[in-house]
Amino acid sequence: MSVTKSAGSPQVAATVKLDLVSFPESAKKVQSQDPNPVNGSSSESSEKTKGITGFQTLVHLVKGNMGTGILGLPLAVKNAGILMGPLSLLVMGLIACHCMHILVRCAQRFCHRLNKPFMDYGDTVMHGLASSPNTWLQSHAHWGRHAVSFFLIVTQLGFCCVYIVFLADNLKQVVEAVNSTTISCHKNETVVLTPTIDSRLYMLAFLPVLGLLVFIRNLRVLTIFSLLANVSMLVSLVIIGQYIIQGIPDPSQLPLVASWKTYPLFFGTAIFSFESIGVVLPLENKMKDARRFPTILSLGMSIITTLYIAIGALGYLRFGDDIKASITLNLPNCWLYQSVKLLYVVGILCTHALQFYVPAEIIIPLAVSQVSKRWALPVDLSIRLALVCVTCMLAILIPRLDLVLSLVGSVSSSALALIIPPLLEVTTYYGEGMSPLTITKDALISILGFMGFVVGTYQALDELIRSGNSLPLSNSTMFIQ
């Protein structure tokens, strides 16, 4: 969380090259904590001149939210109803955006109070607990930081694992269907797949590319890849959108509100589609003019929520009860609509580096601080390479990885996005006086987050038990953003 940054700083052109020459950003953060005033001034000046612009921040924010989960939202709307589904998505978008604003405000408050240039999620929670009126929370405040760091690492690396599965599965589907793919898109013919190599070999094939991408440690350079990912996914969504609006049948047969028994399925799928709170403070910390961040945050979440509602509602209107787990499975088997999968492969490939950035900025400074400046860069790059290899190996070795990660994500994602922020607001401002309405609001949001934890955990456990004997080596990615 940055306090003073020049709004008029010249925009630095981002160049597509690996930032391997300069000293690692993570090492710079460690140095910036040095009590030596010379080092501190130099680091702060560097941050002012090399921060990211408002547009770059918006690009990263949109990309941090828009992942594979949007493809499953039409089925989620089916489980809620054609009226209840879009309304619920709107409410979830507003709550998620509000929780992000809470986190930013609390971080700003402690930066001003403690005279610090920036503050991450873990620091903010630690100082929030330290300022609470409860003595037990004050004495155990450091555990709040450790818990947040653990949740962030598990969640973000979990996304990276599932992205590898998504890349391999979608490329494999396109290759296997290539012989039956036609030029004409007027008929939705049955696809006869031609068996090819195992999907796990596709995962290994992506590993060298992912290894190069995670070496990019500069958010300004990552903007190029985030922009490419946004364009790829936007084009694919436009292709999907133009198809589903061509033949929308009479919607009067669709239920306005679905059965309460299926609503938890909607809730469990939709709540994790808004999971990007882990990238909020890292982006805000890197901005040249952090005062503009709340506006950019609201704009970005408005774009995401609108896209979610449009794809979810229109997809269900078009296909009704025939909607599949991923809307791409309802598209005709022609090259135009097969290209949607290829575009998403490009988009997710570029997204991997951004999701990897958050856990890297937590883990690497701890290791770099233990070695001399001479070894900082080799240690930095070695840890990045080791982490991406671990995520690839987990994707290869663990059957039904998506369900295992959905189980873990039910705890960590709900805690990070909905449970911790409102409780953090209470611990931060309670001593200064809070209205009963604000306390009630924060309590209700935390209860909603806890419901997401319970529903998501039940859903993942149920799927794990039912799939134990049926699809032991199947990996799907519908529950992870």
UniProtKB/Swiss-Prot annotation:
GO terms for cellular component: endoplasmic reticulum membrane; plasma membrane; recycling endosome membrane; vacuolar membrane. Its main location: membrane. Inhibited by L- and D-pipecolic acid, nipecotic acid, isonipecotic acid, L- and D-cycloserine, and L-2-azetidine-carboxylate. Expressed in lung and spleen, and to a lower extent in brain, heart, kidney and skeletal muscle. Residues 26-49 are annotated as: Disordered. GO terms for molecular function: active monoatomic ion transmembrane transporter activity; amino acid:proton symporter activity; glycine transmembrane transporter activity; L-alanine transmembrane transporter activity; L-proline transmembrane transporter activity; proline:proton symporter activity. InterPro entries: AA_transpt_TM. One of its GO terms (biological process) is regulation of proton transport. The keyword Transmembrane applies. It holds the Pfam family Aa_trans. Residues 1-56, 101-146, 217-220, 284-295, 365-377, 424-444 are cytoplasmic. It is found in: Cell membrane; Endoplasmic reticulum membrane; Recycling endosome membrane. It is a multi-pass membrane protein. The chain crosses the membrane at residues 57-77, 80-100, 147-167, 196-216, 221-241, 263-283, 296-316, 344-364, 378-398, 403-423, 445-465. Residues 29-40 have a biased composition (Polar residues). Residues 78-79, 168-195, 242-262, 317-343, 399-402, 466-481 are extracellular. It catalyses: glycine(in) + H(+)(in) = glycine(out) + H(+)(out); L-alanine(in) + H(+)(in) = L-alanine(out) + H(+)(out); D-alanine(in) + H(+)(in) = D-alanine(out) + H(+)(out); L-proline(out) + H(+)(out) = L-proline(in) + H(+)(in). Keywords: Cell membrane, Endoplasmic reticulum, Endosome, Membrane, Transmembrane, Transmembrane helix. The keyword Transport does not apply. Belongs to the amino acid/polyamine transporter 2 family. PANTHER family: AMINO ACID TRANSPORTER, PROTON-COUPLED AMINO ACID TRANSPORTER 2. Electrogenic proton/amino acid symporter with a high selectivity for the small side chains amino acids glycine, alanine and proline, where both L- and D-enantiomers are transported. Extension of the backbone length, as in beta-alanine and 4-aminobutanoate or methylation of the amino group, as in sarcosine and N,N-dimethylglycine, are also tolerated but decrease transport efficiency. A free carboxyl group is preferred. This is Proton-coupled amino acid transporter 2. It comes from Rattus norvegicus (Rat).
